[in-house]
Amino acid sequence: MVKIGKVEMYINEELESGKKLHFVLIDPDDTHPEMAGRIAELCENVGVNAIMVGGSTGAEGEMLDNVVKAIKESSSLPVILFPGSHSGISKYADAIFFMSLLNSRNPFFITGAQALGAFTVKRYGLEPIPMAYIIVEPGETVGWVGDAKPIPRHKPKLAAAYALAGQYLGMRLVYLEAGSGSPEPVPPEMVRIVKSVIDVPLIVGGGIRTGDQVRELTKAGADIIVTGTAIESTKSIDEAKRKLEEIRRGLK
């Protein structure tokens, strides 16, 4: 029997208690270890639920390891890898979103990278969390790198079909991604329709910058909100703290 690991169990228990969750994504390509540690400490202090580490390009090897270690040294939050490919794996993390980019046109991002990385995940003893990853317009860098056919913003049923297929394939999470730095988030109506057909937790990320957007997305059905660029683009730790607190207020 497949056992659910500690991180996934923690996520499920938090959601079952009626909470909406906030994960912060740190890209090692844009954030040096010292800053990653400071952001992680801040995240824990304001009530963020987990740290995701990864990026579309460049997040691998010693650079990735050093960022993960700095985060682990600075906070007790779960660290979940969010790899761009099979090279984005660090033995120092707690878990990995073992995800398939369902609407890629390239089989490498659907099952190829996963096959190449599977033995590394097993050897490192990382907790794999199976996840259906779906790119929504505009898709930004991740859409281009992952050779995705982004779901049109006005076609929510297409997103729902992919999400339900992911659930039926055994994925225990669905992630709707507008792309890091997207001008706007996934449309709330798309979130609502996807949530109405799936029975697994729904993550929404990309283009989320304000508490009002968070409020709208969680009201539509998002269980977990992911922010990255909104925090990375702040000019100081104090500004990052204010932004995190604003986003946290949107969850309530």
UniProtKB/Swiss-Prot annotation:
NCBIfam families: GGGP, GGGP-family, PRK04169.1-2
InterPro entries for this protein: GGGP/HepGP_synthase_sf, GGGP_HepGP_synthase, GGGP_synth, IGPS_HisA/HisF
Binding site for sn-glycerol 1-phosphate: Y175, L176, E177, A178, G179, S180, G181, G206, G207, G228, T229
CDD domains from the UniProt entry: PcrB_like
Known catalytic reactions: sn-glycerol 1-phosphate + (2E,6E,10E)-geranylgeranyl diphosphate = sn-3-O-(geranylgeranyl)glycerol 1-phosphate + diphosphate
Domain of life: Archaea
One Gene Ontology molecular-function label: magnesium ion binding
Biological-process GO terms, alphabetical: glycerophospholipid biosynthetic process
Pathway: Membrane lipid metabolism; glycerophospholipid metabolism
Name of the molecule in the record: Geranylgeranylglyceryl phosphate synthase
Catalytic class of the enzyme: transferase
Annotated residues for binding of Mg(2+): D27, S56
Keywords from the UniProt entry: Cytoplasm, Lipid biosynthesis, Lipid metabolism, Magnesium, Metal-binding, Phospholipid biosynthesis, Phospholipid metabolism, Transferase
Its biological purpose: Prenyltransferase that catalyzes the transfer of the geranylgeranyl moiety of geranylgeranyl diphosphate (GGPP) to the C3 hydroxyl of sn-glycerol-1-phosphate (G1P). This reaction is the first ether-bond-formation step in the biosynthesis of archaeal membrane lipids.
Enzyme Commission number, as recorded: 2.5.1.41
Any one GO cellular component localisation term in the record: cytoplasm
Similarity field: Belongs to the GGGP/HepGP synthase family. Group II subfamily.
Localisation: Cytoplasm
Cofactor dependence: Mg(2+)
